[in-house]
Amino acid sequence: MGETKHILKRSEQKKENMWSTEDIFASDEAWKAEFAAIKGEEQALAAYAGRLSESPEVLLEYLRKSEELGLRIEDLYNYTFLKNDEDTKNTVYQGLKGQMTGYLVQFQQATAFETPEIIAIPEETLQKFYEECPELRLYERYMYRVRRRKEHILSQAEESILAARSEERRVGKECRSRWS
């Protein structure tokens, strides 16, 4: 008969074999401080609704703010999901993951206008924007990728409804995976 292998607990692992979540946030308190700092930032982006085609400067300003917030959200998300995956029975990280997921729904609802508005900008107008504001070209690839999905994009209202329902879908999936 074969030898039974002992599966190491996280506390028994060598540090070099573990994720270095402290490279993202030094502590849970640092994560909580950053999470508190971004709460409401999605509303600053929502203020651009109906304005993205106003001028190249407005579009560039929105894209920069969205990118900056997106990177901050990505760090928050990665930290909570990695910490949760370290020990899926740890209720502290289940809670942080739940908070983060809830915030993502709010963010998606607040920015549901982005894709439909970018798609609605006529190609000639967009080319004119690039000429008037060369810095906007930094986002040219992004704009192309958004616009090529035109046939598959819903209206702002429909995108917002889908964003709102994503929390319900996530909870169902999480329950299934936890009990599997």
Where do the PLM segments sit?
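A well-structured
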Residues: 1-176, 180
